[in-house]
Regions:
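Short, well-formed alpha-helical segments that are part of the catalytic scaffolds
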Residues: 11-25
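Acidic donor-binding loop at a coil-to-helix junction in glycosyltransferase catalytic cores
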Residues: 165-171
């Protein structure tokens, strides 16, 4: 098995079908798709199975635990991760795999969907500028919705740390000590604007807190409120 895709999911029966359909349209099909059912109380597991995904159950509530469970269950040499409310563009995996030579991890940009065209453009270009800056500073900013890494390398550094947020970024920092972590600008993933439910200012303040190491929890409302 060359490539596994892992999706952590807590009560995602509504969003998950669109994510799995987006993966089915990939120009570079993954060898397996794993949905980690993270203490769901809805039909997340049944939805995943209906789409042919392999379901892994993680009873310990928290996205870091779910990602770690997916990493351990994956059979692929490479493991890509996205979120259950995200829509990888059709060439997402193809773009990442094309740039993998010599790298231990790769990541790409995000754009919100479900917002106005202006807000979508703002989210994408603002995030791209941030990623370019971090890449220049050699501070890779892996995002759980758009990342891929060598499974062996991730296991070597212990996988995802047990934190409430930034588990993806912290894994990226650890992987960067082993080898190149590469930014791939054309490997785009669309992600749900439900993260903006409280508005742009609270969202940006939360991201700043996360960046400064004072993360907010993901399960504040019983769901994954990243």
């Amino acid at each position: 098995v060359r490539l596994s895709v892992v999706i952590p999911a807590h009560n995602e029966e509504t969003y998950l079908p669109s994510t799995l359909k987006a993966l089915a349209r990939q120009t570079f099909p993954p060898d397996e798709v794993i949905v980690v059912d993270n203490a769901s109380t809805d039909r997340t597991a049944q939805v995943a199975e209906a789409f042919g995904a392999r379901v892994v159950h993680c009873g310990r509530k928290g996205v870091a635990f779910a990602r770690q469970a997916g990493l351990l269950a994956a059979r692929g040499e490479w493991v890509a991760m996205t979120d259950a409310d995200s829509l990888p563009t059709p060439t997402w995996l193809e773009r990442l795999m094309a740039r993998r030579e010599g790298a231990v991890a790769l990541y790409g940009p995000l754009r919100f969907y479900g917002v106005s065209p202006l807000e979508a453009a703002f989210s994408e270009w603002g995030y791209r500028a941030f990623l370019h800056l971090m890449a220049l500073l050699r501070r890779p900013n892996l995002a759980g919705a758009n990342m891929m890494f060598l499974r062996e390398a991730a296991l070597r550094v212990g996988g995802f740390p047990e934190v409430e947020a930034r588990e993806d970024v912290l894994l990226g920092y650890a992987l960067a000590r082993l080898g190149p972590v590469r930014y791939v600008p054309d490997a785009l993933v669309l992600t749900s604007a439900r993260r903006l439910k409280r508005g742009w200012v609270p969202f940006l303040l939360q991201q700043l807190k996360n960046l400064l190491g004072r993360p907010e929890g993901y399960f504040e409302d019983g769901g994954r409120g990243r």
